């Protein structure tokens, strides 16, 4: 961990604020006549995803930290624990769902035997990185009838992980679809 001056902090930097890792989302530098330089930061807490704002004076410092990724295969979920295997060391990594809201949001997108990037800080997993769009198989569709509609008609579909999303009427059981992992919305059908 290194100490950096407030003027050296860039967008995308990782900082330790009050003992918790944050990423810099926005950085605004302003220099007033007599008051000196001010750096305004918009930061996202990497553990709970809350966004905060911090203002630093030109002479202030912050602690820069190193965040790294570990490639791991998702094995299974056992009650409130997600179990992964580190693909480099073959060690099992267990993540308690009660410890972090980050993990709870990712569960519907995790598929057994798939590879994910675990975001690490100080040898502790703080997040699971998902692809922007993830492929799923449709296992159940809600009955829907085509009719005269002004807008796009949508129906609920259940995916192989239990995730339920709205999709167009032409989606059927057995189809493969892409779902946006951030919005949890149907993106497109995968043509086979």
UniProtKB/Swiss-Prot annotation:
The keyword ATP-binding does not apply. Keywords: Cytoplasm, Elongation factor, Protein biosynthesis. GO terms for cellular component: cytoplasm. One of its GO terms (biological process) is peptide biosynthetic process. Its main location: cytoplasm. Pathway: Protein biosynthesis; polypeptide chain elongation. Disulfide bonds: none annotated. GO terms for molecular function: translation elongation factor activity. NCBIfam families: efp, PRK00529.1. Belongs to the elongation factor P family. This is Elongation factor P.
